Structures are given as C-alpha cells and as structure tokens.
Amino acid sequence: GGCSLRNASGRFYPNAHIRQSLGSSLNIPAVKALYINGIENSLETLHQLGDVSYCSYGETAGLSMAIGSGCRVKMVEHANAYASIARGGAYKDLAYVLEVKNSSGDIIEKWEDKPAKQVVDPQVAYMISSILSDPTARRLMGWTGYEFGFDVPGVWTACKTGTTTTAVN
C-alpha cells in the first residue's frame, strides 16, 4: 500500500530550498532527503546522535520515519540528539543522576563527564543549527508567529517545529 503524503498546510511547495523545507517542517522534502540518504544510513546516524530507541523495537517505518511516523520515540533521547547537533555533531551520554549520597550526606557515587564522540561533521551540524535558529526559515508556510522570542544574551538558540499526525499542533 501507498500513502498520500502532504504538508501540514495541505499545500505543495515545488521550489522550496533546504533551509525553508527544514525550517517549515515540510514533509515531502523530508521524505525525499531520507530516500536519497537511505533509511539505514539515516537511522544509524540518528542512533549515534543519541536517539537510540527510535525505530528500535522491530518497527519498520520505512520512509515515513522522516516525518516521525511509525516509530516510538523517547523524548529525552530525541532531545539529546538535538543537543548533539547543537554541540557541533558531538554525542554525549545522558546523565539522569549527577550524584548519590548516603544517609550521612556522603557522596558514594558521582557522575563524571566523559569526552564527546564526534558523529556528524561539524559543518553539517552548524548548517542544521543555523536553519533551526533562523525564524525566517519558518515563514514559507506563513508561520510568522513562530519567531518564538528566543533571545538569550550570549546564547545561540534554535528550535524545531512540527505537527501531529492530525496537523492539530
């Protein structure tokens, strides 16, 4: 069986550039990019970035995984994958517990930061971060309200928009 792929707006954007496509969360270019890069290559990179559970439960989402369909995701891992992109493509393990103390207050175990593992070319990570931090990249679909107001002095901020299957939010 096939599927009827469409963008959240219901419109087709034949001349959208990569910046506009990613910034506006266009589905058709996302699926085409996954097709070109290959499902296995893309999934391996996604896992290396920290989204280790995505499509890891015997799920076979095929090209629909490009738009988040067909696979379970752990949001903490998904956020870590984006953090890896923000670190210039370098992965770091998640840290859920920073230290453990006994009843006397003595530290019996303490988390230690480990060196990051480079999994994506820093230039590629920079380009992705640049797109995700560019509010003008989200304007293709008329999302002028999606400026998000991220203004943290001295901090480069980025975000990724998206919609649910029913395009409600």
Protein language model regions, located:
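A penicillin-recognizing enzyme superfamily signal
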Residues: 1, 20, 24, 71-169
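Active-site-adjacent helix/loop patches that line small-molecule binding or acyl-intermediate pockets
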Residues: 2-52, 59-87, 127, 131-134
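The feature captures the short pre-catalytic strand/loop hairpin that immediately precedes
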Residues: 54-59, 108-110
